[in-house]
Amino acid sequence: MQNKISRRQFLQVTGASAAALLLAGLPVEASAASGHLTVTPDTLVSDLRADPTFAASGVWTWQSAVDSPDTPEAGTTLSDYVGANMAQDSADALNYLADTYEAGTQVTYKVYSPEEIAADATRDGVELYYWPSEVPGSKFVVVMSGNVLNNTANMSEGYATAWRLHQMGYAAFVLRYRVFLKAKDNAPVADLGNAVRFITTHAGQFNVQPENY
């Protein structure tokens, strides 16, 4: 049975900051059960981005989403990058995405159609990252992390929150939305609305409830 989540629990899960709506020197470790890098809080961000599975999956591995993504200094670990309090949940979330992708399930989805992107190139980076529920016909949650200004905080608030919600039985989606110079005319709000439309339109594919989400 799928657990219900109270407002208080949601704020605890998200750290109240999925707002706007939701050591070095260690060897690179490959998972024994899969071909991808096993992400831990001590994994170097550079190793994560160099991993073929993560690169092929299309998963966004940045925090800021301004015109030029932030580039951590050499030797920056996941814990350094997202914060120690979110590092383990972020690592677990990333490993699950990689496992899901390697098992043959798409985990990255464009929110806008090719025609919509052709009409407005800023829509091209608007994406959903998908943690399937293990409960058929589950409810879904769209996590919109960051400050809706210049930082989507996907790698910290977004993925950590999605992982906790996934563990509660929900299908979780993290939205990468437009920020900074691309966020004109209430673009983040439009991105959220279109993300929900995309999920409900493809509810059968995602095996989620198209209503009461």
Indicate residue ranges for each PLM-predicted region.
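Short beta-strand element of the alpha/beta-hydrolase
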Residues: 138-146
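Short amphipathic alpha-helix adjacent to the substrate-entry channel of hydrolases
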Residues: 156-173
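Short acidic-hydrophobic catalytic motif
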Residues: 37-77
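Gly/Ser-rich "nucleophile elbow"/oxyanion-hole loop immediately N-terminal to the catalytic nucleophile
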Residues: 198-213
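Cap/lid segment of the alpha/beta-hydrolase catalytic domain
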Residues: 146-157, 174-187
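N-terminal secretory signal peptides and thylakoid transit peptides that target proteins
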Residues: 2-18
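C-terminal segment of N-terminal export signals and the immediately downstream linker at the start
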Residues: 3, 24-47
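N-terminal cap/lid segment of alpha/beta-hydrolase-fold proteins
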Residues: 78-135
